[in-house]
């Protein structure tokens, strides 16, 4: 049990959330461009 609490205590959740949101933003850009190309340019 000490291993689990120590593991979650040592994780920096702010850094994890920031990296998650940055990766979502980086992925969403090409996805929007790809969808626009498929639909012929009109949303």
UniProtKB/Swiss-Prot annotation:
Function of the protein: A core subunit of photosystem II (PSII), probably helps stabilize the reaction center.
Membrane-topology annotation of the record: Single-pass membrane protein
Listed name of the protein: Photosystem II reaction center protein Psb30
Name of the gene this protein is made from: psb30
Family: Belongs to the Psb30/Ycf12 family.
GO BP, sorted A to Z: photosynthesis
InterPro entries: PSII_Ycf12_core-subunit
NCBIfam families cross-referenced by the UniProt entry: PRK13686.1
TM regions (residue ranges): 15-35
Quaternary assembly: PSII is composed of 1 copy each of membrane proteins PsbA, PsbB, PsbC, PsbD, PsbE, PsbF, PsbH, PsbI, PsbJ, PsbK, PsbL, PsbM, PsbT, PsbX, PsbY, PsbZ, Psb30/Ycf12, peripheral proteins PsbO, CyanoQ (PsbQ), PsbU, PsbV and a large number of cofactors. It forms dimeric complexes.
Coiled coil regions, renumbered to chain: none
Keywords for the protein's UniProt record, in alphabetical order: Membrane, Photosynthesis, Photosystem II, Thylakoid, Transmembrane, Transmembrane helix
Subcellular location: Cellular thylakoid membrane
GO cellular component term of the entry, any: photosystem II
